[in-house]
Amino acid sequence: MSLQFILGSAGQDHRTPMVTALAQQVTAHPTDQSYYLVPNHIKFETEVDVLSALKEQIAPEQALFAQTQVQVFSFTRLAWFFMKNEPIYQLPRISPAGLNMLIYQIIQTHADELTIFRGEVDRPGFVSQLATQLAEFKVGQVTAADLMSAIEQLDTTNTDLQAKLHDLMIIYEAFETQMMGKFVENTDLLNQLATYLEQQVDLQHAHFYLEGFSQLSAQERQLVAILIQRSASVTVALNLDHGYPQKLPDKTTLFFQSAKLYQQLYMVAQANRVPVLIDQQAKTARVSADLQALDTYWQASQTLSPQPSAVEKPTHIQIVQAANRYVEVSRVATQIRQLVATGNYRYRDFLVLTRHLDAYQTVIDPIFQAQAVPYFDDADIRMADHPFVELLNALFDVQRRNYRYADVFRVLKSELLLPRDADGELMAVPAYRQALALTENFVLKNGLEGQHWWTQDKDWVYNRFAVGDGGVQTTRDDQISAQINRIRRFVKQTLPPFFARLKVAATYTDAAAVLYQFVANAGVSERLMTWRDQAIAAGDLTKAGQPEQTWAAFCDILDEFHTILGDLPTVLPDFQALLQAGFAGAKFSQIPSTLDQVVISESGIVQANNRKITFIMGATADTMPDNQIPTTLLADNDRQDLSARLQQVDDGTYLRDDAATQLAGEPYLNYLAFMSGSERLIFSYPAMSDDARSGLQLSPYVARIKDYFGLSIDIAAANPVAEDEAILPFVGTRRTTLRHLVQASHDSQLREVPLSRSWLYVLNLLRTDPTYGELTTKLLGSLSYRNVPTQLTPDIVTQLYGTKINTSISKLEEYYANPYAYFLKYGLNLQERDVFALSPASTGEFFHATLDGLMKLVNDQKLNLAALDDQQLREMTDEVMAKLLDTTENPQFAILESSHRMGYIRQQLMKTMRQMAKTLQEQSKRTKLRPKRTEVQFGLGDERGLAALSFDVGKRRQVTVRGRIDRLDAVQVKDKTYLGIVDYKSSEHKFSYQEAYYGRAMQMLTYLDAVKQNLPTLLDAPTAKDAELAGAVYLHLQNPILKAAEVLGEDPLTSLLKAEQYQGLLLDDPDLLTNLDTLFGTPDYSGSSLLFRGLRRTKTGKITSYGKLLVNSNELDLLLTHTERLIKRAATDIFDGRVDLAPFREQNRTALQYSPYKSVMQFDPLLKENNYRDLPSLNKDDVMARIAAEQEQEATDEHEI
């Protein structure tokens, strides 16, 4: 028996003296057994390396070498080796999924006994967190009895920790009881192995070699203690400057953990009278001279010892700054590829580290794939994110939430459940996807939520009824109906029977059987195997293993349901939660697909030291040192208190280090990463965060290294520069190099500089490449592409619009906002997907229909609105709304009955309409204007409607404008009739001369023009001859909320009228204005109108306005003529094929703000050819002057013609 330590820094070669000792032992005692123990993470690589090194020392001349007396194991593999035939090893191995399930069941069973954990079981991640805590107790040799003793010793003031330990003790005790004799987990095996080796195995001819450990858990330490006591020899390699048999160094020193382990093992040997041989120093350097200098510096920098003199600027240590993580990973992958291309390296010579891989997970794969660099990413992949697990969760959610749209389509979009045809074959995926997309559109458009829609006997009927269909059901509609009903029937025939069987499952075993039979019979396993085969065909072996592993985990979980919960009565919510808890603890096991590949890993875990070059990415102040401490159930202060009490009970028990101790170990963890490569070390970091909102700082560790060695920071450019000759960072595979060539060529074009000779050489190579030549020409040709729409040909215009445009004025307003958007929407008829929702248009329709119905009802009953009492008014308003909300007559308002939320909105809409009815009544009492007609249509073919506005625009082409006027008011003054327009709006509107001039707000003027053109129809001949337009105003339909300050000192009704005033454009005619507000007819009145915002009567009796509200007859004619000119100009441009990409910009508003076509237009203001059409600010005088000048110029042009 003996204990031997081999000591040295991480830059020294520990492996060679270890293998030398092993070779001597094998040669001297060929029948003895030797075991080389390393952390599980590096077992495979170490086995290959150790056996290769052993061959060189024992049989260098042999072509083949085998050694049965030497085994390379991890601790868990050592347990398998010795105990594989023992009864304990034959017990069912409980998986992490089953562990979560068992803990969940224990919490539910003991809920009445628990205090603070009782309500935590449904919190995401809690069960896994609790499983981790119990595993920590196991590894730390802490029993439930130890927790009880600790509780008794705790200070009574620490009630929170007492409550936690109380619950943990109950759960842990139940857990140990449930596990005993039924299951075994990996954390149990080491204890069993220690007992087994101590009691049943003769280790006198066994030799153990430990490498790669800096600290051991209580379980591992107990096991190693048995090995020291009973084996022939134990040799331990440690990263340590010298031995520490008595006094430990300070906790902040670099090698504290290794020194502590040295002392623990030394004391075990001393206590058992096992000879401790003289420490052997690892004297041979494993790393290059530059890395040796870094090793020396880093050791000295962690102590108060003098700093060593700086060496010459090292060439094998490098720091690279990249613009972002994408550029950073691209630089790493490119450099690896280039170094392998030299012939001096293999891919396996590279190790890429970062502290947290999740920050790089989305960019590593596409970049390394693009650079054709084989790699193995050893980051854990959660099984809970697999589509099969999502399918299982969605299935239960469909049942629990009554076939909610999102849940049903989560099931269907998993593509694991597919309909079968008459021959039993699964539906082809492309056809299924098309049918599913159509079904989703149909469901969204019609708001089909709930089981009854999916399980009804009657088929769904699809009807598009778009413009031009004439309401006729087409063959295409029938085909779509067949597709969507195939999906509906599939849901009906598949899900309800499953839910019915699950509902009557008496026990958890029954429920597990029902679930298994359902997914098996539905062809889910077939689909998973199809995915596996597709991944194998694509060469993605990592992804290929996931379907089988997920299915195997699913089967194991169901087996554990039977074993753990068995005959307990089924509680379906718990069944789903247990299933989720099971998968929450499962991870995919990953196996390298080839020996020659780059390893990508995290710097916080031990790495094999057989690499030549290490890249450390993400070397920022946020992660080096790392400040992310895993969240556990026990806070640091709890951990310290409990550890102290446990040490009093049994000094062989301890917990994981607290946050302060972990942070103190950061220099050592990073030191191991620095020394992991033998030749070079390359740091890199992104200058910007992922969201590009904040800058990232270089790690203080790397900054110290930089300053000490006088290193400069290399900048990894995001894009190449056209004239640069040093283009190596941008040269990788042909495809990735082509991407950078395009970027360089674009830079050359923008800055008008020639491409460098290096880029021209690359250009020539790619153009003549048989595979990429055509693509090179095509992509470089894109540089001459300009994002400018091509004017439409006359034939296309005729096919799209014919020779007559029938339009509304709002559509022409859209043309003036952005001609190209008009073409997309009304030329190509591109539409967004219909969604069952209460749109502003639907709300407006309800408002308009209610007020129109109220006015007609009042007129039909020959009543005077102003004379109605409140009860009559409310009854009549409610009568109108009741008819409107009858969904058999008006299905467009069915959405207001679709949910409780919509029911609330319906009540709010009705309140608004009751208030507006009251407003209209009060307004009618205060003005002589009276509604003449409501919902006056022009150009829509209504018998009572008015003629459309029609204009010839040359070449036998015509534009016809149609519309609907909400309300037409009239007042008779001195034998003259004035007609005015009221337009109802659900939001605040004001008349803008500027917007009217630019064609952005033509509605009111167009409606006035329609009234003017149709005066003979609206009035009898004598009256029409002298009639004038009164103007056009907006009325905001609302139920206003008044502030206290607004109603103090005046009648509340007056305040309400002020909040609901008309505003718009009025004719500046004293006779008219006097009759607009009865207050103005009062001789002594001076002040503002209650009805029309901005209108006031002065003390002299003159009626004026602020905001340029009033226009005279000539100005109104100018505005109407200009509007007609805008209509004809827009029509002419449309017929001429003008589809300019010219969105307006007015102060902080643009035509693109709410456009659904941005992805189609690809408008980029940074491009020279893409420019906003800026609209200069104009006031009324500016507008009138411009219109007058334009009319004068037009008249001059016509005269000259």
From Swiss-Prot:
Cofactor: Mg(2+)
Source taxon at top rank: Bacteria
EC number assigned by the record: 3.1.-.-
One Gene Ontology biological process: double-strand break repair via homologous recombination
Swiss-Prot/TrEMBL keywords: ATP-binding, DNA damage, DNA repair, DNA-binding, Exonuclease, Helicase, Hydrolase, Nuclease, Nucleotide-binding
Description of how the protein assembles with itself and partners: Heterodimer of AddA and RexB.
Family matches, as HAMAP family: AddB_type2 (MF_01453)
Protein name: ATP-dependent helicase/deoxyribonuclease subunit B
Gene source species: Levilactobacillus brevis (strain ATCC 367 / BCRC 12310 / CIP 105137 / JCM 1170 / LMG 11437 / NCIMB 947 / NCTC 947) (Lactobacillus brevis)
Lineage summary: Bacteria, Bacillati, Bacillota, Bacilli, Lactobacillales
